[in-house]
């Protein structure tokens, strides 16, 4: 059997802290795997298959923040961050979809490799985000207001144009631009079966998946 390296170990559920520009950055890391002084950071997520297929930018941001915290923790050791992974537990995994599509996750639990940033990008991101929160705190102290989160942070859906039959809610087809919707509507009207089978175009403004009304989950 192989003799393990002195630093080899697994650390589960550890919360780390680091001071950045006078503020405390904190993160709870699900799993740290150290092998031959190389650290793999693993985060567990219950998510959808589509999140794995299309990816989520916030995963990359989150795990690189964990990488920053680990780099501070192991600063005076030989241990270096080597890789970042998401262990995705897919609540909606479908065996039939996996058999039909190569790009569909092939198991209900999969590992997703996350890009590890270089030190310059990582330090810049951490510094910028801390600065943004500090500025927001100053504004709140002055006039009681916070800046709004960005559309990406609020998971805003894109605007769409739905071609639908008059008085019916269900769309015949939904488009990402008005011009395409108009072309489809024109072609549909040419081949309609009944004189009263009229259509209309309904504009659907992009909604926020997060932060509906006065609710904020952050």
Model-flagged regions — what are they?
Residues 17, 47-49, 89-93:
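Short, solvent-exposed loop/turn segments at secondary-structure junctions
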């Amino acid at each position: 059997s192989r003799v393990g390296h002195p630093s080899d170990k697994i650390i589960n559920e550890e919360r780390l802290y680091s001071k950045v520009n006078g503020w405390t950055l904190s993160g709870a890391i699900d799993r740290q795997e150290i092998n031959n002084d190389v650290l793999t950071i693993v985060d567990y997520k219950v998510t959808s298959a589509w999140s794995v297929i299309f990816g989520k930018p916030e995963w990359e941001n989150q795990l690189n923040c964990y990488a920053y915290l680990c780099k501070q923790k192991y600063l005076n050791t030989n241990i270096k961050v080597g890789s970042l992974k998401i262990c995705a537990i897919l609540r909606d995994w479908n065996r039939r979809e996996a058999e039909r599509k190569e790009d569909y996750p092939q198991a209900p639990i999969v590992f997703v490799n996350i890009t590890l940033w270089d030190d310059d990008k990582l330090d810049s991101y951490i510094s910028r985000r801390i600065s943004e929160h500090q500025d927001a705190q100053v504004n709140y102290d002055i006039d009681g207001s916070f800046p709004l989160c960005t559309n990406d942070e609020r998971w805003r859906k894109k605007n769409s144009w739905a071609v639908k039959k008059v008085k019916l809610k269900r769309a015949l087809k939904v488009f990402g631009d008005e011009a395409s919707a108009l072309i489809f509507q024109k072609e549909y009207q040419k081949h309609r079966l009944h004189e009263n089978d009229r259509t209309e175009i309904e504009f659907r403004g992009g909604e926020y998946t997060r932060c509906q009304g006065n609710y904020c989950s952050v």
